[in-house]
Regions:
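Single conserved hydrophobic/aromatic residue that forms the stacking wall/gate
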Residues: 1-12
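Short glycine- and Lys/Arg-enriched binding-loop motifs that mark or flank ligand-binding interfaces
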Residues: 3, 19-21, 52
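Flexible, charged surface loops at secondary-structure boundaries
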Residues: 13-15, 71-72
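Active-site groove signature of glycoside hydrolases
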Residues: 15-26
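Conserved AdoMet/S-adenosylmethionine-binding subsite of the radical SAM
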Residues: 24-152
Length: 152
C-alpha cells in the first residue's frame, strides 16, 4: 500500500489500535517504503501501535544493521524463529543467505535492545521437542516466544 492510499484509509478507520507490517514477502525488503509509511502513520495517527512481523533477515537484505533504524518508527517486532536449529531452518525456510539462522538470532538480540516489545514466533506444527528447544532459545535471550496455532 502506498502512503497516499494508506493515509486515506487510515482517516476513515481511526478506531484501529494497531497496524502490522507483514504478509507474503518480507516487509524489510522494501525498507525505505516501509519506514516512510510508518513515519506517515506515526505523524497522522500517533495512538496507533505499529508492529513488524519479519523473518529477521533485514540486516542481510539491506546490507547494514537495521533494528535501531526500524525502531524509530515501529513499536514492536515479531520474528519468525520457525525452528530450533540452523539445519532445520535451512530445510524449512530455504534462505538465500548463508548462516541465515544465526543472522536472524543476531537481529533478534539487537531488536530486544531497541523495541518496546520483541518476540519470536513459531507454529505449533513442529515436534514438541523442537518447541521446547525454541522456548530455551527464546528464554536464553530474554525474548518472549509466541506459539501460534496452525490454521488452514
Amino acid at each position: 500500500i502506498g502512503v497516499g492510499l494508506l493515509g486515506s484509509e487510515m482517516c476513515i478507520r481511526d478506531s484501529y489500535k494497531e497496524l502490522v507490517f507483514c504478509g507474503y514477502g518480507e516487509p524489510t525488503s522494501a525498507l525505505d517504503n516501509m519506514l516512510e509509511t510508518a513515519k506517515y502513520v506515526r505523524e497522522k495517527h500517533p495512538d496507533i501501535k505499529l508492529r513488524l512481523n519479519t523473518n529477521g533477515l533485514s540486516d542481510r537484505i539491506n546490507n547494514k544493521p537495521t533494528a535501531e533504524l526500524i525502531s524509530k518508527y515501529i513499536d514492536s517486532v515479531s520474528i519468525s524463529l520457525n525452528t530450533c536449529s540452523s539445519e532445520k531452518y535451512d530445510e524449512v525456510c530455504r534462505p538465500v543467505f548463508d548462516h541465515a539462522y544465526e543472522s536472524m538470532l543476531k537481529f533478534a538480540e539487537d531488536a530486544k535492545k531497541y523495541f518496546e516489545h520483541t518476540q519470536f514466533s513459531i507454529v505449533d506444527t513442529i515436534p514438541e521437542e523442537d518447541i521446547k528447544a525454541c522456548q530455551k532459545i527464546a528464554d536464553d535471550r530474554g525474548i518472549h516466544l509466541k506459539i501460534r496455532k496452525y490454521s488452514d
